[in-house]
Regions:
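Short secondary-structure boundary segments
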Residues: 1, 7, 97-99, 107
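Ferredoxin-reductase
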Residues: 2-91
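Short, Lys/Arg- and Gly-enriched loop/turn segments at beta-strand edges
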Residues: 51-58, 100-108
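Helix-loop module immediately N-terminal to the HCX5R catalytic loop
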Residues: 89-102
Length: 108
């Protein structure tokens, strides 16, 4: 499936690692094609097959990859996680350019 990424809104992110933790829970690491700035506590929005969902970022802002914990939610409630579960290292997803969320760690 070819998807045109809207400039200024989305970018591609490549799956660089995937670690299955349980039957329905895994970690995945994404390498965005552009620098992705975020604060601890924010989330990113990723997509595949025209479906988008928000996921809390588990990695540090100092890392060059985005680490996510994903729980499989089967259809009909889960539309994106079954697609993400089928991804292999090297596959790409869309990612919104900006992190969101106001529940961030405040400096002391």
């Amino acid at each position: 499936m070819t998807l045109n990424v809207v400039k200024g809104k989305f970018m591609w992110a490549k799956l660089t690692k995937k670690e299955q933790l349980t039957e329905d829970l895994w970690k995945m690491w994404l390498k965005p094609e552009e620098k992705f700035d975020f604060k601890p506590g924010q989330y990113c929005t990723i997509g595949s097959g025209g479906i988008e969902r928000a996921y809390s970022i588990a990695s540090s802002p100092d890392e060059d990859q985005i680490e996510l914990f994903i729980e499989l939610v089967p259809p009909p409630d889960g539309n994106l996680t079954p697609l993400l579960n089928e991804l292999n290292v090297g596959d790409t997803v869309t990612m919104r350019l900006r992190a969101k969320g106001i529940f961030v760690l405040k400096p002391e």
